[in-house]
């Protein structure tokens, strides 16, 4: 898919998404971070916000692989107006947490990327992460705590102002 951003820069969003997924799968944080602007932000559904290329690279190389291995990430049906890119995804990994006992767990979601000059300025997602948490074998109380944190984060977003009044 090709998109033209407001500055007239032509972007191959299919190539961007392919490299995005591939860099995570091969544990290449530096390549992943290069897809972002210098001041880019990645909002992870589990770990929170990572700001700047160095922190984003550390997220992939350290945080993601601390308790998981053998990542698989695929993006489908991208839609973009040149400023925002949406894509449905499937994501799985082999969890190394004791509760998971080496099981492959996964979930799906939608990636939302704000773009600037052909790079990702901000990444966030709407993820069915509770599916993966249950597959890991987390206790219901632990899942509830994680979901409560995500709910609080969502309600701080400006789009929620009208719903929170």
How should each PLM-predicted stretch be described?
Residues 1-38, 143-165:
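Short, low-complexity N-terminal intrinsically disordered segments enriched in polar/charged residues
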Residues 71-73, 105-111:
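Short, surface-exposed coil-to-beta transition loops
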Residues 29-33, 37-83:
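A solvent-exposed, acidic/Ser-Thr-rich amphipathic alpha-helical stretch
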């Amino acid at each position: 898919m090709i998109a033209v951003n407001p500055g007239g820069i032509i972007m191959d969003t299919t190539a961007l998404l392919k490299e995005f997924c591939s860099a995570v799968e091969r544990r290449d944080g530096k390549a992943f971070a290069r897809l972002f602007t210098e001041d880019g932000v990645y909002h992870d559904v589990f770990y929170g916000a990572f700001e700047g290329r160095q922190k984003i690279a550390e997220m992939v190389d350290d945080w993601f692989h601390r308790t998981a291995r053998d990542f698989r990430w695929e993006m489908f049906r991208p839609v973009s107006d040149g400023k925002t890119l949406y894509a449905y995804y499937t994501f799985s990994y082999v969890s190394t947490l004791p509760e998971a006992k080496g099981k492959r767990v996964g979930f799906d979601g939608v990636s939302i990327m704000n773009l600037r000059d052909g790079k990702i300025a901000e990444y966030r997602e709407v993820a069915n992460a509770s599916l993966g948490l249950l597959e890991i074998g987390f206790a219901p109380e632990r899942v509830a705590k994680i979901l409560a944190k995500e709910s609080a984060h969502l309600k701080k977003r400006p789009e929620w102002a009208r719903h929170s009044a």
